C-alpha cells in the first residue's frame, strides 16, 4: 500500500453540499495548500439514537450518489487518490461508538439483527457504487467500538461488500482500539483514528506495531488531527473542549505526529480530519 498523505474532505455532507463549483474550488484549494495526495470522502447514514435499528442512507442528511460520483471524478481529475468511508451517525448527537443492543434478543427491545441488516445494506450500496467509480480503498465504517465484538455479523457484512466490490477493504477503529477487533483478518488494510496525546503518539505507535506485524496488514491513521485550542494537544479530538484559540499548540501536535511517522516507515501515513 502506497503511503497516504490525505485529508478527510467535507465529511458527512448533507444532500446538495458536494454539488456545484464552490466545493470544487475548495477541493482545488485543499490540494494546493496541503500537498495532499489522497482524499477520503465520507458519505453518511443516520439513525435516530444509538439504540435505533433503522439506518437511513438516502434522506436529506446524506450525500446523493450522483454528488459523490461527481466529486470523486473532480478529485481524480486533480490527480488525487480517492478512498471512501461510508459512516453512520446518530441524529441525537451520541457518538457512533456507543451504538449497541442487548447481546441476547428480548422481544420488546431493539436487536442487533435488524441493525446489522441495515448497516450491511448501507455498506453494500456504497461498495457497488465504489466498484463503478473505481475506488481504490473502501473503509467500512469508523469507530464502531461497541459493535466490533459482533464478529459473525461483521464478517457477513464484509463478505456482502466483497460480492460487489473487488477493491481493497479496510476498517477504521477508534484510538486505543487496535487490539480489540477480532476480525482484522477479514480486511485488507487496518486503520485507526490517531487522536493520541501529543506526548504519547510515539509510545502508542510502538504499542500498535506488533499488532500490525502479527496481522501482516498495511496500517494507517484514517483520521488524525488536533483542534486549534489551548489544551487540545492532550485531547486532540475533544470537540467539547473550551478555551482560547492556540495555533502554536495545534502546530506542536502536528509536528509531533509527523516526526513520529517519519521514524516509523511501517505506518503507511495518515488522513487528517477536516
Residues covered by each model-derived region:
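Distinct, well-ordered alpha-helical segments
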Residues: 19, 95-96, 149-158, 173-189
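Substrate-binding cleft and catalytic face of glycoside hydrolase catalytic domains
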Residues: 3-5, 36-53, 66-147
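Short, acidic/polar
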Residues: 16-32, 116-129, 174-183, 251-260
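Glycoside hydrolase catalytic-domain groove-lining segments
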Residues: 63-65, 70-71, 77-81, 85, ...
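Active-site neighborhood of glycoside hydrolase catalytic domains
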Residues: 121-122, 137, 146-172
Amino acid at each position: 500500500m502506497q503511503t497516504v498523505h490525505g485529508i478527510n474532505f467535507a465529511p458527512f455532507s448533507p444532500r446538495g453540499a458536494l454539488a456545484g463549483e464552490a466545493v470544487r474550488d475548495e477541493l482545488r484549494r485543499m490540494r494546493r495548500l496541503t500537498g495532499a495526495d489522497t482524499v477520503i470522502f465520507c458519505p453518511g447514514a443516520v439513525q435516530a439514537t444509538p439504540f435505533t435499528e433503522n439506518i437511513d442512507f438516502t434522506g436529506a442528511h446524506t450525500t446523493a450518489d450522483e454528488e459523490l460520483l461527481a466529486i470523486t471524478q473532480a478529485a481524480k481529475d486533480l490527480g488525487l487518490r480517492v478512498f471512501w468511508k461510508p459512516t453512520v451517525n446518530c441524529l441525537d448527537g451520541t457518538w457512533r461508538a456507543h451504538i449497541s443492543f442487548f447481546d441476547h434478543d428480548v422481544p420488546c427491545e431493539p436487536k442487533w439483527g435488524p441493525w446489522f441488516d441495515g448497516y450491511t445494506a448501507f455498506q453494500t450500496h456504497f461498495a457497488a457504487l465504489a466498484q463503478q467509480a473505481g475506488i481504490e480503498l473502501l473503509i467500512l465504517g469508523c469507530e464502531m467500538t461497541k459493535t466490533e465484538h459482533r464478529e459473525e455479523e461483521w464478517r457477513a457484512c464484509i463478505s456482502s461488500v466483497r460480492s460487489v466490490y473487488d477493491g481493497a477493504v479496510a476498517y477504521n477503529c477508534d484510538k486505543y482500539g487496535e487490539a480489540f477487533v477480532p476480525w482484522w483478518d477479514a480486511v485488507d488494510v487496518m486503520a485507526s483514528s490517531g487522536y493520541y496525546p501529543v506526548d504519547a503518539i510515539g509510545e502508542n505507535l510502538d504499542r500498535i506495531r506488533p499488532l500490525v506485524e502479527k496481522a501482516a496488514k498495511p496500517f494507517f491513521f484514517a483520521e488524525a488531527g488536533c483542534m486549534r485550542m489551548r489544551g487540545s494537544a492532550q485531547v486532540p479530538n475533544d470537540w467539547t473542549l473550551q478555551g482560547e484559540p492556540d495555533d502554536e499548540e495545534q502546530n506542536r501536535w502536528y509536528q509531533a505526529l509527523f516526526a513520529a511517522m517519519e521514524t516509523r516507515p511501517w505506518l503507511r501515513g495518515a488522513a487528517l480530519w477536516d
